[in-house]
Amino acid sequence: MSVSALRLIRVRRLSTSGPAVKRALPWRDIRRIAKVTGAIVFGGCVFITYEVVTLNQALTIDTSAILQEKQKSYIYPTHSTNREQESLASGLTIKTRRELHKAARKFLEITSRVLHHPLDEHLSHLDADPHECALWVLLKRSRSADRAVRHLAVQELAHNHHWRDYQYQTAAQVVDQRTAVALARIPNVDLRFFLPPPPLPHTEDDISIEDGLRQLLASLPQSDVDQCVQYFTSLALRESSQSLASQRGGLWCFGGNGLPYAQSLTSTPSEKVETFCLQALVQHSKVRSHCEHIVANGGLQLLQRVYQLRRDSPKIQRNIVRIIGNLALNENLHTTIVQSGWMSVLAEMIQSPHIMQASHAARALANLDRDAVRQKYQDGVYILHPQCRTNQPIKADVLFVHGLLGAAFKTWRQKDCDVTDDEKLEGVREDYTECWPKSWLAADCPNLRILSVEYDTHLSDWNSKCPVENQRKSLAFRSQELLRKLKDAGVGERPVIWVAHSMGGLLVKKMLLDAAKDPDLSSLIKNTKGILFYSVPHHGTFMAEYSVSVRYLLFPSIEVKELCRDSPALRDLNENFLNIAKDREFKVLSFAETVPTYIGPMLKILVVPAHSADLGIGDLIQVDVDHLNICKPEKKDTFLYKRTLQFIQDALGGRRIK
């Protein structure tokens, strides 16, 4: 082959050469790559998910275990007992626990420094989150020797609602007795600040509450006590579930509260027996020496059992808290009361929407709060306002005194009225108040201290709660008893306005006459500025003339006998009081009823006529209501309440008390 021919062949090869053709991958290789990639992605997801779940389990607290320990010894977290595996997840778990333990140790070190060193020593180098530091600083200040600093710290503690749950639980264990009582008297305080009652001790042989109350009563001293205490104790020990007859009252309601046993107790016999026993314990708790016996014999724990069992019985709960309030009059028992778990109970009850419940708790807490309250509130003296700690200065006292068969709360309720079904659906009575001095007067005059007193009265010795000591029912005895209680409450240290209904007005006059003769009570007379009378029988009543028609007056009590028309005792009382009232220039306003009152079947009388309600000085205003409703305004904007409010403001100097 020639040279030219070879060149031609090479040129043709070069001209026909093009880009290299790619070789197509077979489907077998594609499936293999997909399997490997999918396995890697799926395995990675499974691994990450496993790590997240493992870490979450390691950091999650067993809340059920915490709640169980909280009931036994309050707040003690349990330790985890899971086995640790030799794996990456186990390593993360161990590392997390170590970090948590370090944080816990650091937290305890900070706590120790805060509680055991002055504030200025640790604030400069305290290593903690701001909210953690703030809590412990306030807890430290709540124990300050400076009273003003303590009170301010308690207010800041209660008003800061950003604390976390564990901080409330920690504070509940750290706060001292004084701070716990103070927190309970702050309005709307968070109840997590208070430890729950400790577990109650197991009773021997599964003893019932009824038997426990009987044993407690039997263990109390029966000698050197007045006859009423002996009577109530013997009555409670004698009655049993089988022999206790159901007590019912009639329609008679002279002072606004019905007969003592007209209030239904429920049909449960055991509950009725418990009520009798609690009434006897109330009488014993009025005796100072018996209070220590009640506590020493396990009374606080037994009352806690009854309280928890009878949460559906407001009357039983009020009697229990009434006993606690009487025990709290003894300062040496305060520590035992607090340690028995009553702070959480009282803090919850004082926030009750029911005024009677809240007022009983307010009295008990005030008697426990020796850091802010100097006065003591004896049995039967209730604080309607202010029931909590307040920064507002109190300028005057207003005292409400009920009448025959009245009560500290129900006498002063809003007027009852018939409500139609349509009105119920519209909710027109949602604003109904159980005690208008608490709901209305306190709102219009927040700088007043409003008190209401209570004492037992009876129309007939047939219905007397304690028929063995008639001298206790006279005006003279009640006057001395109430004067002593009011002095303990600090009444007379500032201007005083008296508001009385029916026989309560006679009692007020007797108290002022007795105070005028006692040098220790001279401030009460000096500071009395005005008296408001609601249908007070200054010159007696016609009630005794109906003894034939009304069976309750067949054997009238001392109270009824003292109300007889043209009674010499009433005449002397009125004349002597008029002399003092004119000399002291008391402001006086009297309301008189004009509508007859139903006091029994087919019996309707004008209980206190206008001429008997006329004291002889001051204004007399006749109102178209009956004897029961003369002290119960229908609404806040009615004449009866507006005129009452105006009188109180005018008697205190013509300025609005705000």
Curated annotation (Swiss-Prot):
Source organism, top-level taxon: Eukaryota
Keywords from the UniProt entry: Endoplasmic reticulum, Lipid biosynthesis, Lipid metabolism, Membrane, Mitochondrion, Phospholipid biosynthesis, Phospholipid metabolism, Transmembrane, Transmembrane helix
Record keyword Lipid metabolism present: yes
Parts of the chain that traverse the membrane: 33-53
Swiss-Prot/TrEMBL GO biological process terms: phospholipid biosynthetic process
Bilayer disposition of the protein: Single-pass membrane protein
One Gene Ontology cellular component annotation held by this UniProt entry: mitochondrion
Claim: Transferase is one of the keywords in the record: no
Pfam families assigned: ZER1-like_2nd
Cited function: Plays an important role in the phosphatidylglycerol remodeling that is essential for both mitochondrial function and intracellular cholesterol trafficking. May catalyze the remodeling of phosphatidylglycerol and be involved in the transacylation-acylation reaction to produce phosphatidylglycerol-36:1. May be involved in bis(monoacylglycerol)phosphate biosynthetic pathway.
The protein, known as: Protein SERAC1
